[in-house]
């Protein structure tokens, strides 16, 4: 059980048999009446977002999620197949369960698969990934003095803004949370 006073961004709670993640929260103490917590919750399974208000100190069941480090091995139709490299056990997730994470997911990548009551819910990517640029405009030497950017399409199909000096075939490090370029990858 968790108190509504202890809500933090990312906290998971269980309401009506579903897992919800706290996206935003605000403790409100009106001049008259009792305090309450206004929150924005996102259903982990469906992605639906709802606003809910709880009394301050209200106890709610906390959803205990399990994380397992698995490797993305291949795709079968619309399903993404992940393998536990120690037990060789396979786990399948649909494209809907993967969601926005699919734009950075490539075969052989280690990710955390989040499960609840034995069923996989979602994928957590590492904070940064190394991907190759497959499509971008050629950079011209001396283009700008301040360092402009241009769009680049990566090997997974993701599009990020990169500095003008980068070209096709270069490997770059990308922040998966903000979709931003972090730097060139050496080696």
From Swiss-Prot:
Subcellular location: Cytoplasm
KW Cytoplasm (keyword) present: yes
Disulfide bonds: none
Domain of life: Bacteria
Pathway as given in its UniProt record: Protein biosynthesis; polypeptide chain elongation
UniProt entry keywords in alphabetical sequence: Cytoplasm, Elongation factor, Protein biosynthesis
A molecular-function term among this protein's GO annotations: translation elongation factor activity
Transmembrane segment boundaries: none
Any one cellular-component term (Gene Ontology): cytoplasm
Gene3D superfamilies in alphabetical order: 2.30.30.30, Nucleic acid-binding proteins
Gene Ontology biological process terms from the UniProt entry: peptide biosynthetic process
Function text: Involved in peptide bond synthesis. Stimulates efficient translation and peptide-bond synthesis on native or reconstituted 70S ribosomes in vitro. Probably functions indirectly by altering the affinity of the ribosome for aminoacyl-tRNA, thus increasing their reactivity as acceptors for peptidyl transferase.
Family: Belongs to the elongation factor P family.
HAMAP family: EF_P
Protein name in the entry: Elongation factor P
Species name: Parasynechococcus marenigrum (strain WH8102)
């Amino acid at each position: 059980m968790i108190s509504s006073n202890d809500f933090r961004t990312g906290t998971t709670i269980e309401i009506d048999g579903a897992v919800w993640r706290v996206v935003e929260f605000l403790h409100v103490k009106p001049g008259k009446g009792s305090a309450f917590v206004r929150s924005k919750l996102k259903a982990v399974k469906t992605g639906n977002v709802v606003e809910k208000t709880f009394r301050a100190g209200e106890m709610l069941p906390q959803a205990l999620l399990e994380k397992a480090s698995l490797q993305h091995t291949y795709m079968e139709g619309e399903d993404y197949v992940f393998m536990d490299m120690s037990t060789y056990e396979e786990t399948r997730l649909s494209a809907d369960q993967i969601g926005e994470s699919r734009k950075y997911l490539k075969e052989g990548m280690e990710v955390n698969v989040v499960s609840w009551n034995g069923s996989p819910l979602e994928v957590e990517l590492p904070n940064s990934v190394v991907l190759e640029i497959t499509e971008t405009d050629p950079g011209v030497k001396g283009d700008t003095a301040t360092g402009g950017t241009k769009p680049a399409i990566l090997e997974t199909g993701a599009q990020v803004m990169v500095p003008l000096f980068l070209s096709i075939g270069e490997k770059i490090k990308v922040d998966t949370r903000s979709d931003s370029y972090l730097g060139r990858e050496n080696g």
